[in-house]
């Protein structure tokens, strides 16, 4: 934590997953990391150590790509011993019936307008997934307490489920001056960045969060960013990834 700041928050999107590499809609499907994704996770740990940015507490989703990324990063930084808290509220956005589908094939089938509305709009969810289908989570024991979880979500739904957890559980850690690391997913982190930077619904549509590059937010006494948008620990790599993001 820099002098004069109340708290430091580090956001990290998991390393490249198997389905990121295959350009498939993933959502709540529990896929692993590619070799590249594991290397990204290791590099993120090196960046944390190089910047002497070692967290006091870790938050992750319930999905292995985030959990594995966090483990590799903290193992690399020799910082595995910190408390860990996990919640489904940090999970990726649920992509409904699109989960498991190839993005390019889906775009060709339904047209760019509908595809982009499902994928990038703030408040248009894809069609719901059918319970009991191959890529549904209704029988997953992780989600028994919430009835198997959602059947589809838009980004607005992710904001609705994540922000109360952030406010009620994570903010108290920040207010005590702890450095908090959140390892999560593209859309759950977009939801949080929208809140932190007070972005409009339209602005967040164009926001991309690269895999495996820590994003640092130093927060003031009101938990507002000292630097709007935060600071990537490898800004050149982040800019390169964002510029090449697939629509």
UniProtKB/Swiss-Prot annotation:
The active site is at residues 14, 92. The record marks 185 as: Transition state stabilizer. Pfam families: His_Phos_1. Substrate binds at residues 13-20, 26-27, 65, 92-95, 103, 119-120, 186-187. It comes from the Bacteria. InterPro entries: His_Pase_superF_clade-1, His_PPase_superfam, PG/BPGM_mutase_AS, Phosphogly_mut1. Pathway: Carbohydrate degradation; glycolysis; pyruvate from D-glyceraldehyde 3-phosphate: step 3/5. It catalyses: (2R)-2-phosphoglycerate = (2R)-3-phosphoglycerate. The keyword Isomerase applies. Signal peptide: none annotated. GO terms for biological process: gluconeogenesis; glycolytic process. Its EC number is 5.4.2.11. Keywords: Gluconeogenesis, Glycolysis, Isomerase. Homotetramer, dimer of dimers. Catalyzes the interconversion of 2-phosphoglycerate and 3-phosphoglycerate. NCBIfam families: pgm_1, PRK14115.1, PRK14120.1. This is 2,3-bisphosphoglycerate-dependent phosphoglycerate mutase. It comes from Mycobacterium leprae (strain Br4923).
